[in-house]
From Swiss-Prot:
Example GO molecular function: acetate kinase activity
EC numbers: 2.7.2.1
Organism of provenance: Nitratidesulfovibrio vulgaris (strain DP4)
Protein name listed in UniProt: Acetate kinase
Biological pathway: Metabolic intermediate biosynthesis; acetyl-CoA biosynthesis; acetyl-CoA from acetate: step 1/2
Designated gene of the protein: ackA
Family: Belongs to the acetokinase family.
Coiled-coil portions: none
Amino acid sequence: MNVLVINSGSSSIKYQLIDMEREVPLCSGLVERIGEPMGKLTHKIRPDAEGEEKLTFEQPFTNHVEGMKRVVELITDADKGVIKDKSEIGAIGHRVLLGGEEIKQSVRIDDWAKGVIRDYIPLGPLHNPANLAGIEVAEELFPGLPNVGVFDTEFHQSMPAKAYLYPLPIELYEELKIRRYGFHGTSHRYITKRTAQYLGKPLDELNIITCHLGNGCSMAAVKNGKCVDTTMGITPLEGLMMGTRCGDIDPAIVPFLMEKKNLSPAEADTLMNKQSGLKGVCGMNDMRDLHAARENGNERAQLAFEMFTYRIKKYIGAYYAVLGRVDAVVFTAGIGENDDFVRAEVCAGLDSLGIAVDPARNAVRNGQPRHISPDGSRVAVLVVPTNEELEIAQATLDVLKG
């Protein structure tokens, strides 16, 4: 079966059509700047394979429907298409940010599921409306085709109350559902399953610490194959230092800044989400630029690097204590998979925990799951490339199979 995976943003649509018999993407792409005077569509045929072909188009897209119609035209094009017509698509899987406590696993989209997505718009004001728009576009363009929602929060629903509750008046949880939800769950779940396969260990016996490090960063403590804690909270702002997000800070800083800098709640939110993290400390949010600046003696870039890796190291220690036994520390996503400097610095000095990195292995880049720890290490340190689209497609099939 071919599964179309859609990740709909407020002004974008990211998509991938996957042949699930071979687990191979037939095409992928991104529609950008929807609603602006001029939009852009980047379409790849046979992505990440030999003979990949990339097509770029610039044209206005008034709304998500227009953008998705153009995608369908490309997918089924007589010359460049990868399928003959829409009937060769068996199902559509949607990435959805927040499903709250009501949705603990991927679900077939119906009125109830759409109602839950709407109910959590106050906690996901940017993503949930956009995700819902993507679902409604798919329902319009592919009538009768099953749509499945795969939620970022699903994997973390196994956390115990002691991990997900905040020490605020309990009435706030009961009334407003203020709690830790966690995000990047699709990636953490995929990495957990791939690590079990790679190590040849039963999933229900696997204890690992997963580190999803990209422009957004999160970690998870996984015990017996299930998440028991994660760094992100009620929103993706909590936890690690990120590209533009501050991560953990003293909450009292927020009202202090609002008073001293005369900030509105929205302005304070923007400061913490879009002007902080690596960007706030050194003016750069791309780790590659930051490394170049470090090499040129930029002290703020060096400080940002040290702060970033220190936070990850600190959470490894915390999650080691939570798990008691750790089979592996696993790095994934853009920085986690490709940045040997970050991995080396994070693991430096953790020998007493059985965590160490072999410099030669750490320098290898091959796009495959691999050990970067020395032979005989008590804890395996691994790099495992993530594939959220494949995980969404697989979850979609699992729902349809029942």
